[in-house]
């Protein structure tokens, strides 16, 4: 139920072992459940949460209010963090989640450093930000390009990264003539944003 659907994710037994391992070392373990759930997912997620509740994870990271409701019903003592996929871009949004009992908000990747500072200074909610990683052509993963072109839902963890495919230019009166667009000597990912890199700004953060 995370947006890393193709990753080698942990089984519930492995999560149990991982919880013991990290807690013995004074660390924390979070579970990511940040898909935008449809009704067809909620019954399976409910069963998953009931089994997950047997393992004392430190927090779950979510984006969907419905998933928050499920976690509250099944794992009421587990902290909830809001994923960057929820697109929290202002102080009022951070405060809204805080009033729902959320402990931390991972702010939207589209914010400037000044905006991050302003929200962090004026909200009671703990904040977190990404400093490295891919940027979506849309606001934090709210993209339908993958669904349209590959029938793979980005918001369900199955993004085909269509924005990074190799594209050519076609003029409508010459449908069989493809004009190359070259950016880096190999191919052009004209719909792909530059990767996020805030390493130089870590001291300011």
Question: Model-predicted segments: where are they?
Answer:
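As written
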Residues: 101-102
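Active-site pocket-lining/capping segments in soluble small-molecule metabolic enzymes
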Residues: 1-88, 106-110, 114-205
């Amino acid at each position: 139920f995370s947006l890393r659907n193709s990753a080698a994710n942990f089984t519930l037994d492995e999560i149990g072992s991982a919880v013991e391992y990290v807690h013995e070392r004074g660390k924390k373990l979070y579970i990511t459940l940040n898909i935008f759930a449809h009704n067809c997912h909620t019954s399976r997620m409910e069963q998953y949460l009931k089994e997950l509740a047997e393992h004392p994870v430190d927090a779950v990271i979510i984006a969907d209010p419905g998933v928050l409701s499920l976690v509250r019903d099944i794992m009421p003592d587990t902290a909830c963090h809001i994923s960057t996929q929820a697109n929290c871009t202002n102080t009022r949004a951070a405060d809204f989640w805080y009033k729902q009992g959320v402990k931390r908000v991972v702010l939207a990747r589209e914010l400037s450093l000044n905006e991050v500072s302003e929200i962090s200074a004026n909200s009671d909610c703990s904040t977190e930000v990404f400093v490295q990683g891919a940027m979506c052509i849309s606001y934090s993963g709210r993209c339908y390009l993958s669904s349209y072109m590959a029938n793979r839902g980005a918001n369900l963890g199955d993004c085909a990264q269509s924005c990074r495919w190799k594209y050519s230019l076609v003029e409508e009166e010459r449908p069989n003539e493809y004009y190359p667009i070259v950016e880096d000597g190999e191919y052009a990912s004209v719909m792909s944003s530059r990767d996020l890199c805030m390493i130089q700004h870590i001291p300011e953060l």
